[in-house]
Amino acid sequence: MSYKPNLAAHMPAAALNAAGSVHSPSTSMATSSQYRQLLSDYGPPSLGYTQGTGNSQVPQSKYAELLAIIEELGKEIRPTYAGSKSAMERLKRGIIHARGLVRECLAETERNARS
């Protein structure tokens, strides 16, 4: 028995089709270009703060990069379970990279909140 998450609870409204249902998991996984499109449409979550016009592109690019890395990490999960050593190493490196980007995004959010 495999775990199938409730995608409707975690997918943005733009990913829902016209009937209000979610596409199958194989077709509903957003690509990095779709994430970037969503990001350019809505921007990163602001946590209730408005961003200044000075460095507003920096957090968006970091956030978009983080989303792209997370998507790439998802591709390494199945080969890792199948025993692929190279996929396991890519997964480890990707997690380390993503953790660094999360720290950078949080620091940027805190800087924007203070200004």
From Swiss-Prot:
Arranged from A to Z, the UniProt key words for this protein are: Cell cycle, Chromosome, Disulfide bond, Nucleus, Phosphoprotein, Transcription, Transcription regulation, Tumor suppressor
The outcome of changing C105A is:
Does not alter homodimerization
Q: Which GO terms describe its molecular function?
A: DNA polymerase binding
Which domain of life does the protein's organism represent?
Eukaryota
Where in this protein does the record put region Interaction with CDK2AP2?
20-25
User: Where is it mainly found?
Assistant: nucleus
Posttranslational modification:
Phosphorylated in vitro by IKBKE at Ser-46.
- Which GO biological process categories is it annotated with? DNA-templated DNA replication; positive regulation of protein phosphorylation; regulation of transcription by RNA polymerase II
Location within or outside the cell: Nucleus; Chromosome
Residues found modified as Phosphoserine: S46
Query: Which Gene Ontology terms of cellular component type are present?
Result: chromatin; cytoplasm; cytosol; nucleoplasm; nucleus; NuRD complex; perinuclear region of cytoplasm
The UniProt record lists the keyword Translocase: no
Tell me, what does this protein do in biology?
Inhibitor of cyclin-dependent kinase CDK2. Also acts as a component of the histone deacetylase NuRD complex which participates in the remodeling of chromatin.
* Assembly mode: Homodimer. Component of the nucleosome remodeling and deacetylase (NuRD) repressor complex, composed of core proteins MTA1, MTA2, MTA3, RBBP4, RBBP7, HDAC1, HDAC2, MBD2, MBD3, and peripherally associated proteins CDK2AP1, CDK2AP2, GATAD2A, GATAD2B, CHD3, CHD4 and CHD5. The exact stoichiometry of the NuRD complex is unknown, and some subunits such as MBD2 and MBD3, GATAD2A and GATAD2B, and CHD3, CHD4 and CHD5 define mutually exclusive NuRD complexes. Interacts with monomeric unphosphorylated CDK2. Interacts with CDK2AP2. Interacts with GATAD2A. Interacts with HDAC1. Interacts with HDAC2.
Belongs to which family?
Answer: Belongs to the CDK2AP family.
Return the protein name.
Cyclin-dependent kinase 2-associated protein 1
Write down the species: Homo sapiens (Human)
The gene designation is CDK2AP1
